[in-house]
């Protein structure tokens, strides 16, 4: 690492006086349960005030799918950690399996349906700390 890179690293724009606002203890998180699966938020503006992103873990039970929805203020990146499913994407459909990632642009209607025998686990991330979602059903 060159000297200019070290200088830039030491010039933080965010004062780091209280690191607790930057940390999340997953043992203390609340999981939202639905008929189709669960959502656990790891980082967002509510958990970490000032966060410019939202990150969560989504579990979808076999044979189930989350409702068709879209996001008003952000795009989404979904990375499959395990399982297989069909991802509805603005009227089209694509098969997703562990190791695959899909980017969903702002305003695109989408949902994920588990077509396999094991629970889907996926990491979801949004480029806003205050994700806005509109459900169509």
Residue spans of the language-model regions?
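Glycine- and acidic-residue-biased ligand/ion/polar-headgroup-sensing regions
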Residues: 73-75, 80-85
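Short acidic-glycine-tyrosine-enriched beta hairpin
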Residues: 92-106
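Conserved GNAT-family N-acetyltransferase fold
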Residues: 58, 78, 102
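Histidine-centered metal-chelating micro-motifs
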Residues: 65-67, 86, 102, 106-112
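A short, N-terminal "cap"/entry segment at the start of jelly-roll beta-barrel domains
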Residues: 2-52, 67, 134-137
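Ligand-binding loop in jelly-roll beta-barrel domains
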Residues: 106-131
